[in-house]
Amino acid sequence: MKKWMTFLCILLLCSSQTLLSVSAAPAKSVSSTPRQTQITVRTATNFKTESDVKKFVQLASKYKISVIYLNVKQDEDDEVPSGYVYYKSKVAPIAKGYRNFDILKSMIKEAHKKSIKVYAWVPQFHDRAALKKYPNAQMKTLVGKKTVAYNQNGEYFVNPLNKKIQKYEISILKEISKKYDVDG
């Protein structure tokens, strides 16, 4: 027992010296990277018209917001079925009320005028539209049974390991990145 105590004391002293030598190093200078102020915004509850976008961007600029995370694909079922998009898509179904109003195009145009970046928020696997397209791609339990809905709307998650789902979700990301001048 005495040998172990001696060993532990020596180990503690060695590690203390190592810590002291590391902490004795001169401090690095603070990065000159400008701070970003970000906001995440849901489309269905905030934007129905071009005017809504303009007002929002004016406020964002006033409060020095530098990045807007814009929900471009629905992930809940309270306003719009999940998986429906808010931009002109050839891949995913377009949400009701957005066939003639491309929120992503509008937000990018207005935000970039004020030097505000726009990041496309694209939820992936809570996707009723994908489940309609690929009914066998529903998430399953470890024993192979379909998962039960987590709410009264009957909403399910699609399986992220399913190759068809992966291809579908990636095609949405590619479409956005090719078609729009998003910043992230």
Model-derived segments and spans:
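Positively charged n-region of N-terminal signal peptides that target proteins for export
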Residues: 1-4
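Sec-dependent signal peptide cleavage junction
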Residues: 15-29
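N-terminal carbohydrate-binding accessory modules
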Residues: 25-39, 51, 59
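Active-site-adjacent "subsite" loops/lids of carbohydrate-active enzymes
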Residues: 31-38, 44-46, 125-180
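Aromatic- and glycine-enriched glycan-recognition loops and surfaces
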Residues: 45-63, 90-114
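Catalytic domains of carbohydrate-active enzymes, especially glycoside hydrolases
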Residues: 52-79, 179-182
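Glycine-rich, aromatic-flanked loop segments that form ligand/cofactor-binding clefts
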Residues: 66-72, 103-149, 184
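Glycine-rich, proline-tolerant flexible connector loops at the mouths of alpha/beta enzymes
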Residues: 72-96
